[in-house]
UniProtKB/Swiss-Prot annotation:
EC number: 3.1.3.9
Biological pathway: Carbohydrate biosynthesis; gluconeogenesis
Official protein name in the record: Glucose-6-phosphatase catalytic subunit 1
SMART domains given in the database record: acidPPc (SM00014)
Active-site residues, as the UniProt record annotates them: 115, 172
Amino acid sequence: MDLLHSWGVELAVYLQTRYGKYEGLFDLASTVADLHTTFFWLFPIWFHLRRDTALRLIWVAVIGDWLNLVLKWVLFGERPYWWVHETKFYGAGPAPSLQQFPITCETGPGSPSGHAMGAAGVWYVMVTALLSIAREKQCPPLLYRFLYIGLWMLMGLVELVVCISRVYMAAHFPHQVIAGIITGTLVAEVVSKEKWIYSASLKKYFLITLFLTSFAVGFYVLLKALDVDLLWTMEKAQKWCIRPEWVHLDSAPFASLLRNMGSLFGLGLGLHSPFYKTTKMRIMSAPLRIGCIVISVSLLHLLDGWTFSPENHMTFYALSFGKSAVALLIPTTLVPWALSKIYPVKTEGKNL
């Protein structure tokens, strides 16, 4: 593996040396590829345009990131920014010099790449949804073919930029981002075939949230009992990150787990709340849908500004869970219900 890692470091050095002027683009690509964008931007937009696609986005994102966590615990992937300092591969000679950035010092294992995996799953859902809409609208065959090729090429381009950005930032090795793309696409393909996710009961949301959380915690405890330290990466991040403030607890494995579980549970609460059942029976006009999107995104932006101290880990994790749940309640229930009260709309019903 050292040889493979050394090739990855050489590529990172090459990218940082030759393409430093694109640092802003790479930083943007990594930021947008984070699942935070899915929960706080893409979901509220898709939910008020095409509900089934929005639900699929959340399920793919949550299941994919949960699997990413488990795989990282199993694969023990290194990260370039600390590996280059600790490896004996370079012997007595000088190790390559890698630049670090504010988003470099993630605290979890590196394989597979969560950004590449999440972006692959989310884009797969959106591309297949757009192609499905084109088929429903009976798009002309030639136009559909151009659309088909164009959308998949766009997804490929986005994934390429995301992968390059993760290597450029010295956060991942090339093989880790490739593994992320493959795994994320497979998760999206499998989850997309499941029809029950569109009609899951609140009980099922609760049980799945409980199962995924319990499995991850149980797996952690089991490996801990076998004397496997799953938090080994935290020490490396704190040791080798050049700026202590760049090491964030919200990139730790359990922080990610609780955020995702909060999102899934919040989605279940939102879809089965009395407020949602009231608005679901109403015919939403285009202006009202746009209003829901704009207000939801605005409120989520305000919610995103709510941060809390990581000094007490249990409190931090609990608040992360609650914040993520509220982030899904806002676009699914609270905003549509409030707008329907302010601007009464027609209720669906059968013609007699």
